[in-house]
Amino acid sequence: MTFNNKLVDKILEAIFPLPEEFGVILQDDEEIEPVDFSYVQEAVVDADPDADVYFGMSKLVICSPHLGGVVIKIPFNGFYYVDEETGELIWNDFTWATGSDNSDYCLTEFEKYKRLRTYGLDCFVAKTFFYKVKSGVRVFIQEEVSSMNDLYQTRKPSQKSSDLVKKWREEGKVHMDSEWVANCLDKYGKSKVERFLYYCANIDPDILEDVHGGNFGYRKDETPCILDYSNYSD
């Protein structure tokens, strides 16, 4: 995968080192200020004025039209929660990621990608690669994908594929967005989709644990794929 590695390095140089406790608040509470990531946003924009910073529960994602069709993913190493008795913010390290390092969901995602490649099923997920270690933190690069939540409209699948997905859903074989699965059928064929569904059900059943509208979508060439498959769970 080719991308603008000079800009990646410039952005990383701007935001590192990161705080030792790098994560978000697990619970929503109107009286608790959210974790302030403005310093990261400001540093990223200083490096690239067109860049944006997004974050979920397990990772920070940096996007820019100048990165060359990729995003930068940086893992959080834990989270804050609100002590019910004192109301204080308490830090807790991640310990339940399912990869070889149970504190790093980006590494989990990368290892899942490598495993899917060995099964010839990597077309269903965004390409993910380890980039480097920066100040003791692993940094990953992933191909840029538009999530279902960000798309105004998506390609309408064929009626044949839609009917088959409806049948599979009635049989309990499909638990994802029906239109997305039907588009997978149109793009990848019935045999490969059946293999992927079997893989998800029997080989890596937690891969779809956290798949929602923000975690799966379409590449620029309109092929469907999952863009966050690290299996975050609280």
Please report, for each region that a protein language model flagged, where it lies by residue.
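Juxta-kinase regulatory segment immediately upstream of eukaryotic protein kinase catalytic domains
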Residues: T2-D50
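Charge-rich, solvent-exposed alpha-helical interaction surfaces
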Residues: L7-A14, A43, L164-W168, W180-C184, ...
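ATP-binding glycine-rich loop module of kinase domains
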Residues: D52, M57-G120
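Short, solvent-exposed loop/turn segments at secondary-structure junctions
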Residues: L67-G68, N77-Y80, V133-S135, V145-M148, ...
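Short hydrophobic-acidic sequence motifs that mark active-site Asp/Glu residues
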Residues: G68-K73, V125, I141, I226
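Active-site Asp-x-Gly
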Residues: D83-E88, E171-G172, Y229-D234
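Conserved structural core of kinase catalytic domains
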Residues: K114-S191
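Catalytic activation segment of kinase domains across protein kinase-like and atypical kinase folds
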Residues: Y199-A201, P205-D234
